[in-house]
From Swiss-Prot:
This is Proteasome assembly chaperone 3. Keywords: Chaperone. The keyword Oxidoreductase does not apply. It comes from the Eukaryota. Belongs to the PSMG3 family. It comes from Dictyostelium discoideum (Social amoeba). PANTHER family: PROTEASOME ASSEMBLY CHAPERONE 3. Signal peptide: none annotated. Chaperone protein which promotes assembly of the 20S proteasome. May cooperate with psmg1-psmg2 heterodimers to orchestrate the correct assembly of proteasomes. One of its GO terms (biological process) is proteasome assembly.
Length: 145
């Protein structure tokens, strides 16, 4: 049975309609997200970035796990015009300074254009300086905030 509004005899209608619906949802959805998989220094690296109304959620994983969770936020400085940053390890390894450095670099970049806080989940196996630079570069090239 054919609808008066929809020409169901057109096989390209469903595909075209699905693409339009997907584009509409992506444009109008309040949460903006990107998911990336990239080989960084021969290590498969998965990165997911989501921007919510009040926070940015980023996951970085080289072993398909969520090991360390860090919350970072920016606030106005008390005595100086410089902002201050609060970095808290909520779960996992709080002894690894590199994870706090990731969080600090990310929240500083987020803070340039937004007052959103950061929730970071990080689990990396390659802790080299080059990997650090490539991961941050990939995130900054694919910002959703």
């Amino acid at each position: 049975m054919n609808s008066l509004l929809i020409d169901s005899s057109n096989p390209s209608y469903d595909a075209m309609n699905n693409d339009n619906l997907k584009n509409s949802i992506e444009k109008n959805h309040p949460v903006k997200s990107k998911v990336l998989s990239k080989k960084i220094n021969n290590v498969d690296t998965d990165i997911a970035i989501s921007s919510f109304a009040d926070a940015i959620f980023i996951t970085i994983s080289q072993n398909q796990k969520f090991n360390t969770w860090i919350r970072a936020s920016k606030s106005d400085g008390i005595l100086l015009d410089e902002p201050s940053y609060q970095i808290d390890t909520l779960l996992g390894n709080n002894q690894d300074v590199l994870f706090s450095i990731y969080a600090r670099q990310l929240i500083e970049n987020i803070g340039e254009t937004s007052n959103k806080s950061l929730m970071l989940s990080i689990s990396i196996t390659d802790k080299s300086k080059d990997t650090f630079k490539q991961i941050l570069s990939t995130i900054f090239e694919n910002k959703v905030w």
